Amino acid sequence: MWDYLKNTTKPIVLYGTGNGADKILNQLSKASIKVSGVFASDGFVRNRSFRGYEVESYSDIKKRLGDVIILMCFGSNRQDVRLNVEKLMQENEFYVPDVPVYGDVIFDANYYEDHKYELELVRSMLADELSVKTFDAIMSYRLSGDISYVFDCEEEEERKLDLIKLPKDSEYLDLGAYNGDTVVKYSEAFKNISSVIAVEPDSKNFKKLCKTVEQMKCGPQVQVVNAVVSDKDGMASLVSSKGRGVHEFSNLVCDVTASNVVPCISVDSLVQDRMVN
């Protein structure tokens, strides 16, 4: 996909203005790929700019540029967003670039070739047709940016939960617990979960998490931790936004002038000598 974008003559526009857009714009800049505009969903335009681009509406982008390539820069499980994406896909050339949650390694054709042995080894270990189909679809999506590959291997929520078999007295770690929605979801779905460690770094979201846990009438014992999960213990100065969760932290170095400093903790420290299922 990245090589294709280098050679296209169509104007390229970004859909979304969050952390994903930052990462995608950085990658495009590194590859000397020009971006012609940025637009947001209706209700999120609000007379603002992003990285030097005026944030436009979809209709304004189309009026100004005509036939465009859209790069979607965020993820969502909301049905209204899904329907809008399907509409945009029908009207435009549309891609969802795969960029890492952390780090800067891009899963492109070169990465695939360099790690082909490991990837084929993983595929050979999959035990059923659905798993192989899903693996192939994810690989095709990550290389092409074509989200329809992912749509083709979707399963109903109940079916996905049925694939998880937990032993009695399992412990569940929620490493980005947000407001506690997934704590509630999986505690209700899996009665074999006896304890939960829910970690959330953002102070506002952490308050929501605590409130959610307090309102749980029954279920597992829940320990809430206001920290950011890392590969080591220490302190981190965070850069928060109004979106879901925390978006960056500065190499686990505590900046004494920062207004938002929280502990960082490793999974090993969270669980100590206990087994995680």
Where are these regions (language model features)?
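Phosphate/nucleotide-binding beta-alpha loop and adjacent structural elements of enzyme active sites
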Residues: 1-31, 35, 41-277
